[in-house]
Amino acid sequence: MRRTACLDRTPCPPRRKIPLYKIFPELYNGFTMNKRALDTQLKFGIPKGSLQEATVRMFKKAGFTINIGSRSYFPSIDDEEISPFLLRAQEMARYVADGALDCGITGRDWTIESGRDVTKVCELIYGKQGLRPVRWVLAVPNDSKIRKPEDLQGKRIATELVNATKEYFKNKKVNADIEFSWGATEAKVGAGLVDGIVELTETGASLKANNLRIVDTICESTTLIIANKSSWKNSWKREKIENIALLLQGAILAEEKVGLKMNVEAKNVNKIIAILPAIKNPTVSQLSKDGWCAIETIIDEAVVRNLIPKLKQNGAQGIIEYPLNKVIY
């Protein structure tokens, strides 16, 4: 090892590599860190941007409270074993693959686009506006003569999802000029800077508002939990990630369901059960009052408004509807 000379011309001792957690302790959420602490800390990436609010809400339903400051990239969480970091979904796979993060939440689209090798832990079907997959669509102005992807031969297309778009047109045997867009993609095609765009949409409302027409769907995407390959081999970290995934999946499943319970005379039980569209067979228990039972079940929230009047008409009493935080099978 080469040594530099000190002021008195004698060789200086070799420099020691200082761990990052000692140089930047704020990166580790203010916890006192040593090697043992790092081994029992899960560095978890929270997506910044469109998924941020929905993700924080899902964590809350799963039992975790995340607080994010207006200018902070280091959220706090009420679990000392988790060290969260706020990061754009587009960058998540890169930092997880490189080991800067143990795991994170991002889209399947950005994971594929990055080309990084990560473990896909589970799918979480939620987005900015609802519980459905999102789509990357090929769109053009309403008055464009372009009707099919092949009409874009030799044309210019702007998108953030460059690699997936190139693969799509390659499979179509269409030679188009695909350029990366830093933002305001919908405005570029409206201004005539490009001939078409590939843009993310949940409902299509924004495209319609910008006088754009969908030509085709490039791909669909859902939210994923991804993990670093080495972290996934660590038994403690893997169990922690799997537990978080289980609770988040339960929270998402509960989003569109409610609990329903009621009192029913024994003679009407079979009639009431026949009306209930339960996930599983409803729970029926004997009440202290002879000849009466309590029925409890979980159903889709969308059917409750039509169901309750029918239950009442068929003898159900004391009907209570209540929200659910998690549903885990």
Residue ranges with predicted function:
Residues 34-81, 86, 106-122, 126-135, ...:
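Small-molecule-sensing regulatory modules
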Residues 2-5, 28:
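Short, basic, low-complexity termini and linkers enriched in Ser/Thr/Gly/Pro
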Residues 83-102:
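Short, structured active-site "lid" loops
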Residues 17, 21-22, 26-32:
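Short, positively charged and aromatic/hydrophobic N-terminal segments
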